[in-house]
Amino acid sequence: MNSISASAIVLWKNTPLPFVVKSYPMSTLTTDWQHLANLALADECLSRDQARAVLQAPDTELLNQLAAAYRVRYHYWGNRVRLHYLLNAQSGLCPEDCHYCSQSKISTAEIEKYPLLSQEKILAAADRAAHLKAGTFCMVISGRSPSEKVFEQVLAAIRAVKERYPLKICACLGLLTPEQTARLAAAGVDRVNHNLNTSENFYSEICTTHTFRDRDQTLANIQAAGITTCSGGILGMGESDDDVIDLALFLRQRQVTSVPVNFLIPIPGTPLGEQHTLNPRHCLRILVLFRFLLPRQEIRIAGGREVHLRSLQPLGLYAANSMFIGDYLTTPGQAPHQDWQMIADAGFVLEDPEGRAIAP
């Protein structure tokens, strides 16, 4: 060893480092997450303690959790991503007091308020959905339940869209009777959405003008009519981990087909306008839990994706297999070309209405 290199070594050894590199042991939980994936693949339900462990795991376990969730997602859905397009077909003026909603009677948020759109405008929105490569066109109207006049107009719009486009149609119309769900089935609707939003235990904290059981009865009416159900929740409203688990378990018991996972967008003028409790890592853990507890279901990253997942949006697709493209009810979404690029960059492909893979 020459004198220069020896001196350099002595200098290096005697020079204090400006920072300390902390050593972390290799994960001891990776096998546990894979065990949970095995349970999901065997259609076995996680215990409550196992579900809590998913939500309460340290951030250092997040990639291991996502890897386990992706095994389940890939088993049932491959690397395909379903796109849904949302139309706010009737906005505002709702008599309900849902604390999260900018369209409720107690909201002072500045939003557009309008009656049901004309069939021409609904068809124009369906055309945009098709051009954005969405497989499902979601028609949403504000209000507790539709009047007979509005309901007839919605049925006519459903028929018109089905005649012109290969899109699947999901209708979100509020509380529905058995007679109304039977008429929706006859009109050719593919799916009806009615979100439970949170657990039964927490429900009275976010709404007092109707109950969790009112919403569940609508789901029962939809299923009795032979229509597939879409129902999920809004996370980040102040609920506990057990409330999140209870919601997912109830959706599993109800055997819903499609599960939108919304993350609260705190809108000024609503009672939850200052509610800021989520971070991107916890949102991803919620998606992992929903995949473990609802392994066969379509899990959709819905409202709040851009706000809460931010730069980690692509990671959500390792647990979820579906997302909205375009705007939400009263808040903007990410530009469609950014969504397509994100999907392609992550190595996923789109799914058309018939379940075939297409390029983003």
Swiss-Prot record:
SUPFAM superfamilies: Radical SAM enzymes. It is an enzyme of class 2 (transferase). PANTHER family: BIOTIN SYNTHASE, BIOTIN SYNTHASE, MITOCHONDRIAL. InterPro entries: Aldolase_TIM (IPR013785), BATS_dom (IPR010722), Biotin_synth/BioAB (IPR002684), Biotin_synthase (IPR024177), Elp3/MiaA/NifB-like_rSAM (IPR006638), rSAM (IPR007197). GO terms for molecular function: 2 iron, 2 sulfur cluster binding; 4 iron, 4 sulfur cluster binding; biotin synthase activity; iron ion binding. It catalyses: (4R,5S)-dethiobiotin + (sulfur carrier)-SH + 2 reduced [2Fe-2S]-[ferredoxin] + 2 S-adenosyl-L-methionine = (sulfur carrier)-H + biotin + 2 5'-deoxyadenosine + 2 L-methionine + 2 oxidized [2Fe-2S]-[ferredoxin]. The gene is bioB. Pathway: Cofactor biosynthesis; biotin biosynthesis; biotin from 7,8-diaminononanoate: step 2/2. Keywords: 2Fe-2S, 4Fe-4S, Biotin biosynthesis, Iron, Iron-sulfur, Metal-binding, S-adenosyl-L-methionine, Transferase. [2Fe-2S] cluster binds at residues 138, 170, 230, 300. Pfam families: BATS (PF06968), Radical_SAM (PF04055). Binds 1 [4Fe-4S] cluster. The cluster is coordinated with 3 cysteines and an exchangeable S-adenosyl-L-methionine. Binds 1 [2Fe-2S] cluster. The cluster is coordinated with 3 cysteines and 1 arginine. The keyword Metal-binding applies. It comes from the Bacteria. Homodimer. Its cofactor is [4Fe-4S] cluster; [2Fe-2S] cluster. The lineage of its organism: Bacteria, Bacillati, Cyanobacteriota, Cyanophyceae, Acaryochloridales. Belongs to the radical SAM superfamily. Biotin synthase family. HAMAP family: BioB (MF_01694). [4Fe-4S] cluster binds at residues 94, 98, 101. Its EC number is 2.8.1.6. Residues 79-305 form the Radical SAM core domain. This is Biotin synthase.
